[in-house]
Each structure stands twice: as structure tokens, then as C-alpha cells.
Swiss-Prot record:
This is Uncharacterized protein UU376. Residues 1-45 are annotated as: Disordered. To U.parvum UU171. It comes from Ureaplasma parvum serovar 3 (strain ATCC 700970). Residues 1-11 have a biased composition (Low complexity). It comes from the Bacteria.
Length: 242
């Protein structure tokens, strides 16, 4: 199951209010200025990350982290969070929403979900106002949650590259290059480096993608050390899992 933050809808400008008029004063006194509001502070929040647990029994936990969280009234935190299945019109509203001030994280429960289905956040509001997403930080959070694995088979001289838990993979274009890395092949004091760029199609196989390195290795019993370095997922650094 994949989730992504939906694009924020454009805001329509509010109509300009009619000018306020005052009755002329009999004694020619000066006009009184309109009173200023006692508290003009507004909620100022920016979401920067989304994390969803694995679906079990059609239920999952969703967490939204914030890079900025300033409230006009610290005691007023009324959240609404909804997700929607792509090509569907019936949103699923999160329940049990709780905000943790220490971690700046909103967590909730999603019910009625299907496994292996793409969902997106269709609504996230705080006190009736739409919450903005920091797209750059949001992408980093998706990459942070993803896992990149590489295994080397000495017998057939192939490596297997597998990407897991990258929640926005299915939303990308089919032939879009999304993962780049170097394969370092070392034997004694000799070092070869092979640069690779993989597309969404190549990474969609749940069993991973095999890359043949026979032409880089000589001898049947040669002892080669192979590792994957400089990996970037959509230009964001990602560590290879052991």
C-alpha cells in the first residue's frame, strides 16, 4: 500500500469587504479609528513527513510530522485527516488522532484499507485551515523510510538490487530514472567502478533486479569484493542495507 501527499488546491481570493462608513459628528469631533483585534496571531504549521505502517486486518497507523508548528491558541488543535484511493471518490477519515508536542508528530488510525492499493492524503486541516506540505522535506521522509538491498552471488557473478518501502514508487513515470549508484568491484589492489541508473519499471519487481558482472570479473575462483556506493533515490542519498 502506497501513500502520498496530495497537491494543495489553489486558494480563491476572498471578496473585498465594503468600506465602513460613519455618521458625521455633530460637534465636529475627529473620526475614531477602528479597534485593532487584540490577537492577530494565526496558526502557522508545515507538514514535512508521512509514515504509514503495514496494513493488517484492513487497518494501518499513519504518522504526519511537522517542521513548523505554531498555534494562535495552544489549547486548540482540531485536526482532520483523510486519505483516498486513487480513482475513487469516497475518502477514509483517520480516527484516534493524537498530536505529540515533543516529536511534532500527528498519529492516527486508518480503517477499511486494502493491501497493495495506492492511496493519497486528500485532506489535512488544522482548526479548519488546510495544512501545507514542504515538498522537499516530504521527499526526504519517503526516502528515509525506503530500504535498498544489494546481494552478490559469487557463483553466477551477479548482484541483486531490491528497493522496498518506497511509498511513492507507483506514482512515478514508468521509464523515469529514479535510482543511481556505483558498483565497486575490487580484487587485490585493482578497483573497477560501474555506474548504474535504474527506472521505476526496473525497480518494480518484488524479487529485485539482477545485474550481470561477468564481463568485469576474470577466472572462476577469483575472490572479488563487491559493494554498492553513492546511491541516490530521486537525488536524495540512501544507505544500502546490510
Amino acid at each position: 500500500m502506497n501513500f502520498e501527499a496530495a497537491s494543495a488546491p489553489s486558494q480563491q481570493p476572498s471578496p473585498t469587504p465594503a468600506p465602513k462608513t460613519e455618521e458625521p459628528k455633530e460637534n465636529g469631533g475627529s473620526e475614531q479609528q477602528a479597534d485593532q483585534p487584540e490577537n492577530s496571531k494565526k496558526d502557522d504549521v508545515v507538514a514535512s513527513g508521512v509514515k504509514i505502517s503495514e496494513v493488517k486486518n484492513n487497518t494501518a497507523t499513519i504518522e504526519v510530522t511537522f517542521s513548523k508548528f505554531e498555534l494562535a491558541d495552544a489549547n486548540k488543535k482540531d485536526f482532520v485527516l483523510e486519505v483516498i484511493k486513487k480513482a475513487d471518490t469516497n475518502p477514509i477519515q483517520a480516527s484516534d488522532l493524537k498530536y505529540d508536542e515533543a516529536s511534532k508528530t500527528l498519529s492516527g488510525k486508518l480503517s477499511g484499507l486494502n493491501s497493495n492499493v495506492d492511496y493519497e492524503i486528500s485532506k489535512l486541516t488544522l482548526n479548519g485551515k488546510e495544512v501545507k506540505f514542504n515538498e522537499e522535506e516530504l521527499l526526504k521522509s519517503y526516502v528515509k523510510n525506503a530500504k535498498l538491498f544489494m546481494t552478490f552471488n559469487k557463483e553466477n557473478k551477479k548482484i541483486n538490487v531490491k528497493l522496498q518501502n518506497f511509498d511513492i514508487l507507483n506514482s512515478l513515470e514508468e521509464n523515469q530514472p529514479i535510482l543511481t549508484f556505483d558498483i565497486e568491484i575490487k580484487k587485490d589492489s585493482s578497483l573497477q567502478v560501474v555506474h548504474k541508473s535504474l527506472t521505476k519499471n526496473q525497480l518494480s519487481n518484488l524479487n529485485g533486479l539482477e545485474i550481470d558482472l561477468k564481463d568485469k570479473m576474470n577466472g572462476n575462483n577469483a575472490n572479488y569484493d563487491v559493494k554498492l556506493t553513492n546511491a541516490k533515490l530521486l537525488n536524495v542519498n540512501i544507505e544500502t542495507q546490510k
